[in-house]
Regions:
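Membrane-helix interface segments in multi-pass membrane proteins
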Residues: 38-81, 189-219
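Short, charged N-terminal extramembrane segments
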Residues: 8, 108-109, 167-170
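Lipid-exposed faces of alpha-helical membrane segments in multi-pass integral membrane proteins
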Residues: 29, 33, 37, 41, ...
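Cytosolic-side membrane-entry/anchor segment at the start of a transmembrane helix
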Residues: 14-53, 77-97, 212-216
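A structural micro-motif at secondary-structure boundaries
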Residues: 111-124
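Juxtamembrane cytosolic face of transmembrane helices
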Residues: 14-25, 31, 87-103, 118, ...
Length: 219
């Protein structure tokens, strides 16, 4: 549930900004949610292409399949961008002011200049697109810069936060209960980060074993 809003006087209480690791944990959860949503849409499209290309005359089917395949590829790229954009814009402009990942990790998104006010739908769209654009134009370096700024700057603002004048804060910031804010990692964030770390380690070990097995089979 969304934390209650506060009177103007209480909104002037100290604010706890969400640090790097809480944001990373929330991002992991949100990535899982949006990835599943994308697959649920894209996979049926792939089956449609396969169905079309295996019907009728092989020559015309291949031609139609090639054209449709290109169309599906373009549509898939659009879906991969549109799903998370709409997801974040809808959730973070709602009364919760947070995506599902942020809700789970006890943080929310607010306007930097409005004492905890909501970030509008289109500003959320711009914020996500700014994040993706910065990441693409810098060949991924923007992600590292965003992580550094989210962890080290005074108000924990990443570049896309500065562009859109937003803050990521504890869910109890700018409410009637500012004393409930937490500066450390919450339980959900710790569990998510721990599981993610274990998965990464196991992935590295699995790849190492596969490479070793391939090397042994060739020798």
């Amino acid at each position: 549930l969304a934390a209650p809003t506060a009177s103007v006087a209480l909104q002037d209480a100290p604010v706890v900004y969400a640090g790097l690791w809480r944001r990373v944990a929330a991002s992991i959860l949100d990535s899982l949610i949006t990835t599943v949503a994308v697959y649920l849409i894209v996979i049926p499209l792939v089956f449609v292409v396969a169905l079309v290309t295996t019907r009728g005359d092989w020559g015309s089917a291949l031609d139609a399949g090639s054209a449709l395949g290109i169309a599906i590829l373009v549509m898939s790229c659009g879906i991969v961008l549109a799903i998370p954009t709409l997801y974040f814009a809808w959730m973070q402009s709602s009364r919760h002011q947070a995506s599902l990942g942020k809700l789970a990790c006890g943080i929310k998104l607010v306007r930097a200049d409005s004492h905890g006010g909501r970030v509008g739908f289109w500003r959320n769209v711009l914020r996500y697109l700014a994040y993706k654009l910065i990441s693409v134009l810098t060949l991924g370096i923007g992600v590292i810069v965003a992580a550094f700024m989210a962890g080290m700057t005074e108000r924990k603002q990443a570049p896309h936060d500065k562009v859109c004048d937003t803050l990521v804060v504890d869910r109890w910031a700018f409410t009637e209960y500012p004393e409930r804010q937490s500066r450390g990692l919450d339980t959900v964030s710790i569990v998510v980060l721990a599981i993610y770390a274990v998965i990464q380690v196991l992935s590295v070990v699995a790849v190492a074993f596969m490479l070793a097995a391939i090397g042994m089979s060739r020798s």
